[in-house]
Amino acid sequence: MSHRYIPLTEKDKQEMLQTIGAKSIGELFGDVPSDILLNRDLNIAEGEAETTLLRRLNRIASKNITKETHTSFLGAGVYDHYAPSVVDAMISRSEFYTAYTPYQPEISQGELQAIFEFQTLICELTDMDVANSSMYDGMTSFAEACILAFSQTKKNKIVVSKGLHYQALQVLHTYAKTRKEFEVVEIDLDGTVTDLKKLEAAVDDETAAVAVQYPNFYGSIEDLEKIQSFIEDKKALFIVYANPLALGLLTPPGSFGADIVVGDTQPFGIPAQFGGPHCGYFATTKKLMRKVPGRLVGQTQDDEGNRGFVLTLQAREQHIRRDKATSNICSNQALNALASSIAMSALGKQGIYDIAVQNIEHANYAKQQFIKKGFEVLDGTSFNEFVVKFDKPIQQVNEELVKYNIIGGFDLGVVSDDFKNHMLIAVTELRTKDEIDTFVEKAGELND
């Protein structure tokens, strides 16, 4: 090239055309019909100096509404939580900052151990036997859990609560479209929790699995013990989609007999960054270990007796046994899993518990303030989210709240007409009393 930063000068183009035997760019694209070719230059501005360009891009970026510029009460799967500063410092180290899969244990012990620690932490939170190295996000983990259930039980029906995140259900239906024999039965809600009578009636001997969220999408805590009692006699698997931060306080799904626990570790060290990337986790019992999707890191000893880590049980993966593999997922979110591991380790067991308690306390305070303001707050024992009914469209309310530097809650009318004019509000440990009071006050004014 004539210049290291300016490729494709006229000289470069002529050399390339000569090499392939074309006289001009027009001749190169001669097979393309002329009526679909653009016969003018693209409407792109001339190049700018770096300082000018950065100034312009920063000006454009400043138009974004972020948690740095506004107070956020938006959750619905992505939350504004405290992330220890050590997280970014550690994951930025060059040893970790790579997308490379650690196939060669002799040069990857650091990354392999980090993944192993992530698996260990997830098992401790969920009270399960085995966890994989991570997945793309919680919704992918959930759909893969359902596929595992179909494969393990040889049954074709899965019963899912409508209390699951609506996008998780969408991903499941997308998976099911490619497997026409699979049947997905959705169970209605009773208020903001699963209708247990309808759930019990739907579970039969043809059911591969029953799946619920804990806490569910509407913020309420499902009765896992009772749900498990409907399942045990039917030889179906019990799948729980759980918020890992909530498990620092709530009884873990494994203690209720869950067979598969999945979710997203975004609450631990992963910022709410315009939709992603996230980090799914997948935990299960030892019985199902050989059907777990994705990577598994195991602990072993080298020939000198030293502790070491390797990718293990790879024969179950699609890059080894494509035709017999349970899953076609052959990757993970190692960097985000590392971020979550560092966050969990920095906080410690007590720190995670304390933050979980603060989420419940702050959310309950906000609930009471909305009730005092005359709002209808839907019943349900919650963690850090709850549902409030408004008299006006939520989109309209949220557009007005932005003027006060407040990001309002999620518009549940997007999910179901049954929740028209209902807002799903998230209140995490980062929300202060003053912020909550201001939010409730402005919401009340806008609702009049």
Swiss-Prot record:
Pfam families: GDC-P (PF02347). GO terms for molecular function: glycine dehydrogenase (decarboxylating) activity. The keyword Acyltransferase does not apply. Keywords: Oxidoreductase. It catalyses: N(6)-[(R)-lipoyl]-L-lysyl-[glycine-cleavage complex H protein] + glycine + H(+) = N(6)-[(R)-S(8)-aminomethyldihydrolipoyl]-L-lysyl-[glycine-cleavage complex H protein] + CO2. It is an enzyme of class 1 (oxidoreductase). It comes from the Bacteria. Its EC number is 1.4.4.2. GO terms for biological process: glycine decarboxylation via glycine cleavage system; nucleoside metabolic process. The keyword Cell inner membrane does not apply. SUPFAM superfamilies: PLP-dependent transferases. The glycine cleavage system is composed of four proteins: P, T, L and H. In this organism, the P 'protein' is a heterodimer of two subunits. Belongs to the GcvP family. N-terminal subunit subfamily. The glycine cleavage system catalyzes the degradation of glycine. The P protein binds the alpha-amino group of glycine through its pyridoxal phosphate cofactor; CO(2) is released and the remaining methylamine moiety is then transferred to the lipoamide cofactor of the H protein. This is Probable glycine dehydrogenase (decarboxylating) subunit 1. It comes from Staphylococcus aureus (strain JH9). The gene is gcvPA.
